[in-house]
Amino acid sequence: MTEAKVEVYYSLQSDYCYFLLDRLLQLSQRQVAIVIQPILGGVLRLPERFKDRDELEQNYFLTDAARAADFFGLPYAPPNPSPITFKPGSLWVAEDEQPLNEYLYRLFVGSTRAGYGLEFLDKVGRMLWDGSTPDWDQGDNLKDKMREAGLDLEAILSSTSWENAKQTLDQNAAGILEAGHWGVPLMVFEEEPFYGQDRFDHLLWRMKRRAVL
């Protein structure tokens, strides 16, 4: 059986990425290399695509996300605070300044470069979305979760400036389009894109057809 690799474009702002996380961890235990590609949320990466979305779409999105979490048996609550700061009165329009998001993505990119992308998502990424830690940005919450992932927060910050992390994020913003879609989560296996957590079973099917599972 040939060792396989799956690239995953993953945004910390996406609940659907969180819904996929446990399945990625399970797949990584099956001699499959999961290569995490950190990517900014769509409202920052593709603001023109999101600026005119309306309340009908937003309301369905909220319904679907809660249903998906229930279906997978996952604890779920939107991050408090949101990593992305939105303009008052808007649905999906971000402010120009994003200090919290930039700080978080320095940790994400730095952890991925250190070879701990999945571990970071399992601890820090999960904390953002499982409702366990309101005010996740306060105190030692991030430091403690980084430690649980085998990472040192201060060392990662020291080695990963925002300007440095942004270079990787810009490369991944181009890479996801080259791979075949703009949305997350996007899984890529042998240059074939699988968009959305609900395409995970299609990914497994393809890998079995290629005799790598």
Give, region by region, the residue ranges found by the protein language model:
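C-terminal cap of thioredoxin/glutaredoxin-like
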Residues: 4-5, 11-32, 121-213
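Short, charged/polar micro-motifs that form catalytic or ligand-binding hotspots
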Residues: 10-11, 55
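Structural alpha/beta surface segment adjacent to cysteine/selenocysteine redox centers
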Residues: 18-128
